[in-house]
Amino acid sequence: MMCAVTVRQIKPDSYEDFRKAWEPDPWLPKLRNALVLRNEDNPDQVLTIGFFDAGPEQLDTVRDDPAVLAGEDKRLRRIAEFEERVVLNGIFELVEDVKDPAER
């Protein structure tokens, strides 16, 4: 599983608009689900994580698709209106899913 992780500082009081702009449309191939988290101490700092049912090579193939590139370009332009800066952006491979031992 691969994860797209981004932390953004968004403009004050823009969360609802940011959230609408952020939503992938169309939904990305191999994207299983996504999480949107807000910093408790700074609600204008938003962490997004997209979980892809793909290995590194499969995700590269998806990301290189011209239709996906065009859709992501549109989405990022929508987001930019509400974004002050990107704090962190990267693709991470899930290497462990650690669970409570009592739930194993």
Regions found by a protein language model. Give the residues of each.
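Short, low-order "capping/linker" segments at domain edges
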Residues: L88-R104
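A short beta-turn/loop motif at secondary-structure boundaries
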Residues: L37-P43
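Short, surface-exposed coil-to-beta transition loops
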Residues: R19, L31-N33, Q45-L47
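Active-site-flanking beta-strand signature of metal-NTP-handling nucleotidyl enzymes
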Residues: M2-R8, L47-I49
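Short, surface-exposed ligand-recognition loops at beta-strand->loop->(often short) alpha-helix junctions
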Residues: V7-R19
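Coil-to-beta-strand transition motifs
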Residues: M1, P29, P43-D44
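Non-catalytic surface loops within mature trypsin-like serine protease
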Residues: I10-P12, D53-A54, E93-E96
